Structure formats: structure tokens, C-alpha cells
């Protein structure tokens, strides 16, 4: 390839600069004030917006989980239980529903959620009765309290 003149060999920066500016302004169109028209202001605003959007992806997960937990806790209180008790007893019953599904059930399927709460409450009562026992010592176990006579 032969370059006949220096002006042909040097790359023209004009078109590239135009499209780079348009790309930044495209991302800044919804901003208020001069930030959506003035390139130097738009560059800073777009860069800051991208930083916020990166951080917001992680924050959104935490916020949504907190929302689901608060919804479940509110619905659980209506049935006379607390959130940790409901979740731990559902796990013991091998109910494989995540917080999002349980939260949606509490809003859109209240009867189904009521049956889940009843299941967890029944599991809790079984655990309490098993822990209390019938008051007798299990076979093969001597007294837990040693009496010296």
C-alpha cells in the first residue's frame, strides 16, 4: 500500500468525534438542565450515572429481600406467629419456597399462605411436645440429676 500524501495517511478525527459526542448525549437525554445538551457537563453526569447504576444493581437485591421479609412478617403476624418461627418451621417441613414466592403468596394467595402458616404452627407445636415429652426418663438413661444418699 502506497501513501501518496501525508493528508491521506493521517486519520481524520472529525467523524469519530461526532459519533462519540452523540453517544454520550444519547445517554444524557433524560437529564435536566444543561447536562442533556452541553457535552462537557454531560460527560460528567453520564459517568456518575453509570457509577450509580452499578452500585444500584447490588443495592436492589438487598432492598427487594428486605421488602419480601417485611411483607412476610406482616402477613405472619396476622396469623399469630413471628417471621423467624415461620421460616424455620417451613424449612423443617421441607417446604422449598423462597422468600419472593412466599411474599407473593401472602399478597395474592392469602388462603394458601394461611395453610402454610398453619403447617408451620403445627410443626412448632409438635416440636414443643417432643421437647417436653411425657415427663418420664427415656429408657437406658439414668437420672440427669445424681442423688447422693
Swiss-Prot record:
* Gene Ontology biological-process entries: translation
What's this protein's family per the entry? Belongs to the bacterial ribosomal protein bL20 family.
Mitochondrion is among the record's keywords: yes
Location in the cell: Mitochondrion
Q: What protein is this chain from?
A: Large ribosomal subunit protein bL20m
Q: Which UniProt keywords apply?
A: Mitochondrion, Ribonucleoprotein, Ribosomal protein, Transit peptide
**MF GO annotations:** rRNA binding; structural constituent of ribosome
Residue ranges annotated as transmembrane are none
Quaternary data:
Component of the mitochondrial ribosome large subunit (39S) which comprises a 16S rRNA and about 50 distinct proteins.
Q: Which organism is it from?
A: Xenopus laevis (African clawed frog)
Record InterPro entries: Ribosomal_bL20 (IPR005813), Ribosomal_protein_bL20_C (IPR035566)
A Pfam entry, by short name: Ribosomal_L20
Q: What is a single cellular component term in the Gene Ontology annotation?
A: mitochondrial ribosome
For this entry, the transit peptide stretch runs 1-9
Amino acid at each position: 500500500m502506497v501513501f501518496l500524501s501525508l493528508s491521506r495517511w493521517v486519520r481524520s478525527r472529525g467523524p469519530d468525534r461526532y459519533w462519540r459526542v452523540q453517544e454520550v448525549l444519547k445517554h444524557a437525554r433524560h437529564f435536566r438542565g444543561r447536562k442533556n445538551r452541553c457535552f462537557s457537563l454531560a460527560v460528567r453526569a453520564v459517568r456518575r450515572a453509570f457509577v450509580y447504576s452499578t452500585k444500584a444493581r447490588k443495592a436492589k437485591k438487598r432492598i427487594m429481600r428486605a421488602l419480601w421479609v417485611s411483607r412476610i412478617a406482616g402477613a405472619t403476624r396476622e396469623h399469630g406467629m413471628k417471621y423467624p418461627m415461620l421460616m424455620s418451621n417451613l424449612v423443617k417441613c421441607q417446604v422449598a419456597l423462597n422468600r419472593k414466592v412466599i411474599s407473593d403468596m401472602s399478597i395474592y394467595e392469602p388462603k394458601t399462605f394461611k395453610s402454610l402458616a398453619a403447617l408451620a404452627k403445627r410443626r412448632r407445636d409438635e416440636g414443643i411436645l417432643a421437647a417436653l415429652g411425657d415427663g418420664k426418663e427415656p429408657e437406658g438413661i439414668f437420672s440427669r440429676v445424681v442423688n447422693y444418699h
